[in-house]
Amino acid sequence: MKLSSILASLALATVQATARPAELAARAPTLFLCGDSTMARSSDSQMDGWGQYVSKYLNIAVVNRAIGGRSSRSFWNEGRFQNVANEVKAGDIVVIEFGHNDVGSPRSNDNGRSVCSGQGAETCVSDTTGETVYTFVYYIIQASRLLRAKGATVILSSQTPKNQWSTGAWVGTPSRFVPMQLTAKDALNDAGVTFVDHHEAVSKMYRKLGAAAVGALYIKDNTHTSAAGADLSSQAFVQAISQKMNGTTPLAEHVKTPVKLVY
């Protein structure tokens, strides 16, 4: 082979090794989950979080960073949102779902999780540490901005309901934090932040299932479901995403088909 032919072959090989061909598909996003025990993996055999099952219904990888006992405030103060921001890459998707542990008042026997009342820039002071505490909406907005700055898109998800049949009659009134996720989304006014009403999706499913079937999903208490209940909650979440219950989200295109319909 002539020297010129050899050099040409080597040059072509170098280009092929270093180029990023247009025909290669873009990197698939990873879904990160931020939440409390209703989303997190549990070591208790009587309960589990829905975040452990959602990967069954998606065609992308899922990283569940939810942890029990956390609120929007404590997840922020403990640096857990920052940890997720350090992990995400541009194009990844993050679901943020809190509310169960945000109740109470920092002004009265503050437990480090309660948020200040209000839906904006209101503040209050912890009666135990002197910490300035902010509202649920404030913490959600700060977390969303942090993650958006890293190139991730954010889905603000309303908290799952408790057992709405616990009294034997249907009680579907949502927690005050359910509409606050939408408030935060609207305040951000960012196309990269969307909202899904997970609470409403699960509520519709519970109405359809009835008191006996729903009661069987709550073994430990009326907040945490069994593994079977967590799986159903994940299916309700995916159905809401796929059917664009509250508009489109970047996760919709990564839902496996056919979609299981649970409500």
Annotate each predicted stretch with a short phrase.
Residues 246-262:
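Short, flexible loop/turn segments with low-complexity composition
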Residues 83-227, 231, 238-250:
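Alpha-helical cap/lid subdomain in secreted, periplasmic
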Residues 1-25:
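Fungal secretory targeting signals
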Residues 71-80:
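Structural motif
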Residues 43-46, 75-76, 167-172:
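Short, solvent-exposed loop/turn segments at secondary-structure boundaries
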Residues 67-72, 164:
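Acidic helix-start/capping segments at beta-turn-to-alpha-helix junctions
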Residues 20-67, 82-90, 94, 110-116:
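Serine-esterase "nucleophile elbow" of acetyl-processing enzymes
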